[in-house]
């Protein structure tokens, strides 16, 4: 399905991004990854404008086109108490501005029928304390998605995915953290990667501008103290 397609993934060296990259490679795609972690990919900070320009230039020089762009790299998570101006600005640069700018840089070489996937978060609609930088960035990329979908109508389809709690190399959930999910378990990177590949396929040709929440039903679960076994421990 994706044989010889050119796929660009930010934050593709670990976690969800790594799984997405692996699944596209299994389908025969040429996958271009940028990540701040060291490895056999383009190493750089996507919060930096010149880095994005250099990376995009390399992809365009090598392949001449882009079929799929997955804006996956996560911003830092800091709250109102500790987050500085610089921290917050960098989080928005990584989480929102980079997605906008890479789309702009690749616009002249987007293949007909191209697909752009933005990885948001269930935090684009709900919050925990002290998560302002991350939550603002995820809310921003969710809104950017439908704006781009309209602007790029006829050129590319643009959708976003909002994962809930996902077991990755960095975080593994156990016990009540897992069983509280209506789906009965925590998500895994393949849950997200499968949706990415579906949305980028011809089977999703009538889907654009959408945000799909993959969170095991957590954001649909009404939680109040003393209701259906839920308890608040102050």
Identify the residue ranges that each predicted region occupies.
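Canonical Rossmann dinucleotide-binding motif of NAD(H)/NADP(H)-dependent dehydrogenases/reductases
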Residues: 2-31
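Conserved NAD(P)H cofactor-binding loop of Rossmann-fold oxidoreductase domains
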Residues: 72-77, 217
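Substrate-binding pocket helix/loop in short-chain dehydrogenase/reductase
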Residues: 79-92, 177
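Active-site helix of classical SDR
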Residues: 103, 137, 145
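Alpha-helical segment proximal to the catalytic Tyr-Lys
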Residues: 108, 149-154, 205
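C-terminal helical subdomain
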Residues: 160-161, 175-207, 214-216
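Short C-terminal tail/terminal secondary-structure segment
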Residues: 208-234
């Amino acid at each position: 399905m994706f044989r010889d397609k050119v796929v660009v993934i930010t934050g593709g060296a670990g976690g969800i991004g790594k799984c997405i990259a692996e699944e596209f490679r299994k389908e025969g795609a040429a996958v271009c990854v940028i990540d701040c972690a060291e490895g056999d990919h383009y190493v750089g900070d996507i919060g930096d404008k010149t880095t994005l320009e250099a990376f995009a230039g390399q992809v365009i020089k090598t392949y001449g086109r882009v079929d799929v762009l997955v804006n996956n790299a996560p911003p830092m998570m800091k709250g109102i108490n500790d987050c500085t101006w610089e921290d917050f600005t960098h989080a928005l640069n990584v989480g929102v501005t980079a997605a906008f700018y890479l789309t702009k840089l690749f616009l002249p070489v987007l293949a007909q029928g191209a697909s752009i996937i933005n990885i948001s978060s269930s935090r684009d609609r709900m919050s925990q304390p002290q998560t302002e930088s991350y939550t603002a960035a995820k809310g921003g990329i969710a809104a950017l998605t439908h704006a781009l979908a309209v602007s790029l109508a006829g050129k590319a389809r643009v959708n976003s995915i909002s994962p809930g709690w996902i077991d990755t190399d960095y975080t593994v959930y156990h016990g009540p953290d897992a069983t509280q999910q209506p789906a009965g378990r925590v998500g895994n990177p393949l849950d997200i990667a499968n949706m990415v590949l579906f949305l980028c396929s011809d089977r999703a040709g009538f889907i654009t501008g959408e945000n799909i929440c993959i969170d095991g039903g957590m954001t649909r679960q009404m939680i109040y103290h003393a209701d259906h076994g839920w308890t608040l421990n102050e």
